[in-house]
Amino acid sequence: MGKPDIIYEDNDIIVCYKPAGIATQTRHIGQQDMESFIRNYRAAKNEPPYVGIVHRLDQPVEGVMVFAKNQKAAASLSRQIKEHTTEKYYRAASRGQGVSGAAVEDEEESFQDKSAYASKVPVDDKKEDTHDPAWHTLTDYISFDKRTNTSKITSEKDRLAKKAVLQYRVISVTPDRDSSQNECIKTEFDIKLLTGRHHQIRLQLAHIGYPLIGDTKYGKPASNNSGTGSKSGRTGGGAREQLALCSYKIVFDHPATGERMTFVLP
């Protein structure tokens, strides 16, 4: 398990790297979480212990997060998230083969036809043009089961369901091997999350036949759990892999100055 890291700090916000395996917030005594990490960090500097949690990453997900250092900043960031003016981008990887008719199939064929195995689409640190034809939109309705801590795709008629929307594009298609050393294909995705539903990315990609590597809730352990994860969200060979999902970029307006700020993991 990696360690949390401070990426940026000023009088109003703290931007951090959250490693996989650490919860954003937990009720379990003695278990490390990001809230405690920041609270202790501020206490060591003789600062008020306030930590404003305005968004979350699931425990097995690594990535960049922003926390508020005061209530005014927390209110501003929370409002931006509610109004969908923040931008959150993820990298994900799957060894799935996709379901018939999935838009990804065309992307994979394009990579293969051009002998583009192991090639990468450059990702600009500025605002992504998600109107580009390379981007596809997934819209589903998701219901959450608190008893099992899982979600499922359901219908718009389900009164408990919430609309879930994301955009994605294929950024690489490479030869790989599963945990049984069978040859397969690994597909890497760039994802823009437009709504923040429970396990949304994991569930929606699994629903179109691309369960994430390392996902034991919505994937197939036999083909999705070999290798070790990395800070980039990419995966390789070895024992067991972490969940191949990384929140690599977040964009928001500074709560005090209004400046548009972008933070990208290296």
Segments from the language model and where they lie:
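RNA pseudouridine synthases
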Residues: 1-266
